[in-house]
Amino acid sequence: MTMLCDFYELTMGNGYFEAGCKDRITYFDVFFRKVPDGGGFAIAAGLEQLIDYIENLHFSDEDIEYLRSRNMFSEEFLAYLKDFRFTGDIYAIPEGTPVFPKEPLVVVRAPAIEAQLIETFTLLTVNHQSLIATKANRIVRAAKGRTVLEFGSRRAQGADAAIVGARAAYIGGVAGTACTISDEVYGVPAGGTMAHAWVQMFENEYEAFKTYCQTYPTNATLLVDTYNTLKSGVPNAIRAFNEVLKPMGITKCGIRLDSGDLAYLTQKARKMLDDAGWTECKISVSNSLDEYLIQDMLLQGAQIDMFGVGERMITAKSEPVFGGVYKLVAIEEPDGTIIPKIKVSENVEKITIPHFKKVYRLYGRDTGKAIADYITVHDEKVDATKDLTIFDPMATWKRKTVYNFEARELLVPIFLNGKRVYDCPPLSEVKAYCAQQVDTLWDEVKRFDYPHKYYVDLSDKLWEIQQCLLHTSQQ
């Protein structure tokens, strides 16, 4: 995967090499400017795949020959690439953490060529998985405690998107996936029921249901909308349950609907099942669902226990791009002095926050809720024993004094001097951590529409550095 990079990263690398600055230490931040779907926060994901990439980063003989064939790279540079390994430092916010615009999700400190060459894959994996985890979390929250499964692999935009997309959705809160390989590789619980083809294969719907119940008596969820949900599907399901499962003493089963007015049909189906004594039968639905459809159906009294969500989750259809960027924020002199750098733009939102930084999350001691994120220069420490005044970096007259709080650093070391120093927790723990961290956000921040803006503020020192660089750049 080393060659999964933008070509300019290689030409710039060759240029750095020729200019004699290949070993110049640089600092890059990965951050995003806008939460997808107008939401209040995003979910960080993709770190484990980034770690795997960094650990296996090297150029093969075939890669070197290809680059030589382009006649754009010096032999000295190609010789350098032949022995290439990542030797720098990487800090990152752990997967599953709610994150906000402008704060660094990943910080890379490395020689210029190394830092440049990992840009594309870093953005690819963090952007994609953070996008899907964020969308999944919205959908799971809309379901109000009901089970949500990821059903999207056949609509994903490529095999990798299906496999790691299911992983990201699991971090965001889904209970499992229909994608078998995601279970095999990442441990995302895989499951499923039947397709309409199963029902069509048999002489009639009842025979299809009876055979399935006989084959999978402890996992019998029947797809009831192949012909007519209320006139044949549900009655035939009840008959199969009565004739196959009931004699076995099995009371847990399910039906699934994949079409029609799901709010109306599930209410009718629930009554039919309850009247027949199948009160423990679960009702599942699918059919191009998203958080808004789920919300609306529940408001309309839909009787649904499980949602299977496919294309609108695995592609994040409503806003299918997570706009993470990778920007130089500092360079380091041979004596260790860090020189902050800034990117200026006519678009104010594109002006970067310079320097090697820390990100603190401030929590109220009395509520346990997140109050604000506070970005500082790397050598600053937050003293939680003293009141802290924070301010909006764009409207500095907006100020708030925080007291009785705890401060937790979000960025943790992943690689130091090229050596991995971080152990990825099991995916189930990442999922649980995500749910716990989302719980620390106020409900106002979690609104789907017009959420309360969460504070992400700069320390006085960092703000002054940014302003100084802005003024200097305009002289």
Question: Where in this protein do the model-derived segments appear?
Answer:
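Buried, small/hydrophobic-residue-enriched core segments of structured protein domains
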Residues: 1-27, 34-36, 72-73, 78-87, ...
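Short histidine-centered loop motifs in beta-beta connectors
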Residues: 90-98, 469, 474
